[in-house]
Amino acid sequence: MMEFFKTADVVVIGGCIVGTAILRELSKYDLKCVLVEKEPDLAAGTTKANSAILHAGFDAPTGSLKAVTNVRGNKLYHELQKELGLDIEWTGSLVAAT
C-alpha cells in the first residue's frame, strides 16, 4: 500500500467537500492521485455538519474576494448539479435588512 503513495503525483488529504473537489478537478489531468481520509466514509467531518447553505455573496462587500468567490462557487454548484445529476433542492433564502 505504501508503494502506491510513493509513486503518486499528488496526495490529497481530507475527503470532505474541498478534498474531493480538488481530487475531481485533478482527475481531468494525466496525474496519479491519492485521497487520504481518516474517517471510514467521505464527507464525514465538517462537510456533513455544515448548514448546507450556498452563500450567494450578497453579505460580503461588493467586489471583495469573498463576494467574488461566493458568486463563483454558487455558480459551480449549479454546473455540478447538471453535470453529475446531483439531487440538490434549491430552496432560496430570506435576508432581512436591519
At which residue positions do the language-model features occur?
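Glycine-rich FAD pyrophosphate-binding loop
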Residues: 27-49
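Dinucleotide-binding Rossmann-like beta1-alpha1 core, especially the glycine-rich loop
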Residues: 52-98
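N-terminal Rossmann-like FAD-binding beta1-loop-alpha1 element of flavoenzymes
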Residues: 5-35
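A structure-centric signal for secondary-structure junctions around beta-strands
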Residues: 7, 30, 48, 90-91
